[in-house]
Amino acid sequence: MKELMNVSTIGFDVAVIGAGPAGISCAASLADIGLEVVILDEQANPGGQIYKNIEKVSDACLKILGEDYKAGKPLVQRFRNSKLTYFSGACVWQVNTDGHIFYSKEGNSHEIAARYIVVATGAMERPVPFPGWTLPGVMGAGGANNLIKNGGVKPSGRVVLAGSGPLLLLEAVHLIEMDVEIGAILETTPAVPNLSSLVNLPKALKRIDLLKKGIVMLHKIRKAGIKHYKGIRNLTAKGNDRVESVHAMKADIPLDIDTDLLLVHFGVIPNTAIFRQLECRHQWNDVQRYWFPQCDKWGRTSLDNVFAAGDGCFVHGAVSAALKGE
């Protein structure tokens, strides 16, 4: 694999944007059949958000992050062994429909061109504004998880987690294993599942492995004696120069919890910035509540030379993203 620092306009068969599981799987597969492939990513190393720093993570952090994170190692190793061009630390800021891509690296702007473009920019945490969300000390649970991956960095002081989704519980488990004090978990998920969610129960039962992972996480949280509230509303972060406490309502009961850090997570959505810049056709998913680019079964968007791979076109998770990249 060639890793270039500076380059003028160069032509490639395919340019892949994003070096997460979908991007590196796609790039490696294309390189295997002899195509000239370039892949660009803003991070210093391949792996995306889900497998961030997988090549350099310590054994102690690897134990905390678990087998799902460890599964990224063979993907990255295959990518490293592929004959392709890799631009790390490259921030793509413009993509044209004619295949020209503009990006910045180390303070300089560059341009490359490709016959086909694969956008594999993955997912992002869903931004949900609430009173006090811009206070210092309020951050995404995914961001906190990345700090663990990057260097085993753990929060100091007391932490409250709020929002919904499995990543919220996963982050809580990671913090428990790092001996971080957790003041409470405030879930917006209803305490009693509504009828619309019960419709999906038969499908859920087909993935007993995932249900088991969820049960194990809940058991660890319960065993640690952490207060876990469900069905909360009116989430508010309070403080002067930084967050000092969290307020929420549980039914008609007010909750006020002192904290040094509030980690929030409300699920993930496709990162569609490049698709929107290219004016690819999008559609709305009424269940997941997000826009995503329309694609055929091969990932081709409404533009003949632009393809989508991974969670950037619909969120299915890292394993599925790698397969879609293939």
Where are the language model's segments positioned?
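Residues forming the flavin
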Residues: 2-326
